[in-house]
Regions:
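Acidic, surface-exposed loops and disordered segments
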Residues: 1-131
Length: 131
């Protein structure tokens, strides 16, 4: 269900940045090496993507010019059922940012990761970047 409101707001149309309560990159990412600045900008665009109930289900493992993207496993299916939509929005944010930075990105599914069983996360895709 999608809800749209019409009319004029009583206060500001925008919430304050502190109210967004986004997780930091350090909470979302595991870095195998220090990432370059353009990689951090791309990850930040993904981090800022809206998600249902602010669930922010994405987790990233960053190595060289690769980002392995995982979905946080949910204790209940209530939030998990929206993950496809949430990830679609996050990928759109990431790809838009990559295009703005003139980066080539291939989204691929790696068999060696998709067949592994991870305790708290589920493998989704990998982003291979070519600056």
């Amino acid at each position: 269900m999608v809800v749209m409101a019409f009319g004029k707001p009583k206060g500001s149309c925008y919430r304050k940045q502190v109210e967004a309560k986004r997780l930091s990159l350090d909470e979302l990412c595991v870095y195998k090496e220090t990432p370059r600045q353009w990689m951090k900008q791309l990850l930040d665009a993904a981090r800022m993507a809206p998600s249902s109930m602010n669930s922010q289900p994405w987790r990233f493992v960053v190595f060289d010019s690769r980002i392995h993207i995982f979905s946080k496993k949910h204790p209940s299916d209530k939030l998990g059922k929206w993950d496809e939509v949430n990830f679609g929005i996050m990928f759109a944010n990431m790809m838009t940012a990559a295009e703005e930075m003139w980066l080539d990105v291939d989204l691929i599914r790696l068999d060696e990761l998709s067949q592994k069983n991870f305790q708290n996360n589920q493998y989704v895709l990998s982003a291979i970047l070519r600056p």
